[in-house]
């Protein structure tokens, strides 16, 4: 009877260890996927931010050029 208990314990142990290892690998894979998703989102946010900054600088440059042109016209007249 003790032999059967030991055998059953061994079978359960050998069955649970690989299951535990697979669950850990699955969690690690999910964590890596989440990190990649977060990095992609940060890159998209940074791209949108840079696009907005570029548009803002273009607008400011246009305003400065217009004002500078007006000053030159006023100085010549």
Curated annotation (Swiss-Prot):
Protein name: Dermatoxin-A1
Function summary: Possesses a potent antimicrobial activity against Gram-positive and Gram-negative bacteria. Probably acts by disturbing membrane functions with its amphipathic structure.
Residues with PTM Glutamine amide: 76
Keyword annotations: Amidation, Amphibian defense peptide, Antibiotic, Antimicrobial, Cleavage on pair of basic residues, Secreted, Signal
Annotated localization: Secreted
InterPro entries reported for this sequence: Frog_antimicrobial_propeptide, FSAP
Transmembrane portions of the chain: none
Organism annotation: Agalychnis annae (Blue-sided leaf frog)
Signal peptide location: 1-22
Tissues with expression: Expressed by the skin glands.
Family designation: Belongs to the frog skin active peptide (FSAP) family. Dermatoxin subfamily.
Organism ancestry: Eukaryota, Metazoa, Chordata, Craniata, Vertebrata
Residue ranges listed under propeptide: 23-42
GO annotation (BP), single: defense response to bacterium
Highest rank taxon of the organism: Eukaryota
Gene Ontology cellular component list: extracellular region
């Amino acid at each position: 009877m003790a032999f059967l208990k030991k055998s059953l314990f061994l079978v359960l142990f050998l069955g649970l260890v690989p299951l535990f290892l697979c669950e850990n690998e699955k969690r690690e894979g999910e964590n890596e996927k989440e990190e990649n998703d977060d990095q992609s989102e940060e890159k998209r946010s940074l791209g949108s931010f840079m696009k907005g900054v570029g548009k803002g600088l273009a607008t400011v440059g246009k305003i400065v050029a217009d004002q500078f042109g007006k000053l030159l016209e006023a100085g010549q007249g």
